[in-house]
Amino acid sequence: MLKVNVDKRILDICPQMKIGLIQADVVNGDTCDELWNELLKEADNIKNSYELLAINNRPAVAATRKVYKALGKDPGRYRVASEALCRRIIRGLGLYRLTTLIDVVNLVSIKSGYAISGLDFDKIEGDTLTLGVGEAGEVYNGIGRGALNIENMPVYRDAIGGVATPTSDEERTKFTPETTTVQININGYGPEMDMEETVNLMVDLLKRYAQATNIQTSIVSNFD
């Protein structure tokens, strides 16, 4: 598995951070009806459980927003992806039906509240991902967003640059229909759903819907 390092600036804010890591060989494709129905069922649960303004208070979302604020980033302007998905659901805007891998990650994201990085393993450069802090002027193209200002935002970097933030993953390492190996990081800046349970849920969904094999998992903490 890839090695994961975390910058001291982030650990100083959330010293109890846990990251669930999953690497697996998969088959991507159009989202099947069974997966889509699971996603819709969880969306209904979110809609029935939260008012719009209460989403910010979900423990995992609140913890991620706390990191943004502590680093000097406005989490109201640059929303955490799990928060943005839940807000969209509550506002009645629905979800986009995308591909199997994207919708599996989206399902776990809204259920757990965690910011989840879903990457094409074969597009990652090097053998290490480092979670650090975005710099002024750093080039980063968010998926479907174009240039994203990641200054003072938590960002995973590989050997050549940024690949994931809690707001958006990077175009360079995104899932495509041709993706055959995934690297998924479940980022627990603060606890909500049990991390082992969250990793197991992700693995189960990947097995059922993406024909996952050669699965490796790990939960990392105590980065000192």
State what each model feature region is.
Residues 1-224:
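Charge-biased, low-complexity intrinsically disordered regions
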